[in-house]
């Protein structure tokens, strides 16, 4: 299994809206990709901005490429997500999942 890790930041006042967008629109839409296994959304708030870490789980790098394209290290954004984000990591990082106890 492959874990795709990416980070983005919102202004503090946009954090709840972005979280709602992730949970109700973006992530449910990924369920249609065969080999997509789910995601974790992590959030850390401070006074000025909120950091989001999104970890998507896929069966293989081939499935990641179906989602992200051949240059799969580039971050993928829906136009609506850009309305919330004030800064982003341009690249996603991929890890091989070696153990899971969840």
What are these regions (language model features)?
Residues 15-17, 63-65, 101-102:
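Intrinsically disordered, low-complexity acidic/polar segments
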Residues 12, 60, 96-99:
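Non-catalytic surface loops within mature trypsin-like serine protease
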Residues 2, 40-50, 76-102:
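Glycine-rich beta-strand-turn "strand-cap" elements at beta-sheet edges
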Residues 2-8, 40-70:
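Short, well-ordered beta-strand segments in beta-rich or mixed alpha/beta enzyme
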Residues 24-27, 32-33, 57-93:
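An amphipathic, aromatic/His-enriched active-site/gating alpha helix that lines ligand/cofactor pockets
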Residues 33-39:
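Short acidic amphipathic segments
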Residues 9-22:
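Short, surface-exposed ligand-recognition loops at beta-strand->loop->(often short) alpha-helix junctions
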């Amino acid at each position: 299994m492959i874990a795709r890790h990416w980070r983005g930041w919102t202004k503090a006042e946009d954090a709840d809206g972005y979280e709602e967008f992730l949970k109700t629109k973006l992530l449910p839409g990924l369920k249609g990709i065969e080999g997509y296994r789910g995601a974790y959304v992590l959030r850390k708030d401070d006074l000025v901005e909120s950091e989001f870490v999104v970890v998507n789980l896929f069966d293989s790098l081939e499935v990641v490429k179906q989602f992200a394209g051949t240059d799969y290290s580039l971050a993928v954004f829906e136009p609506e997500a850009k309305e919330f984000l004030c800064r982003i990591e341009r690249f996603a990082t991929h890890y091989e999942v070696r153990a899971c106890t969840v």
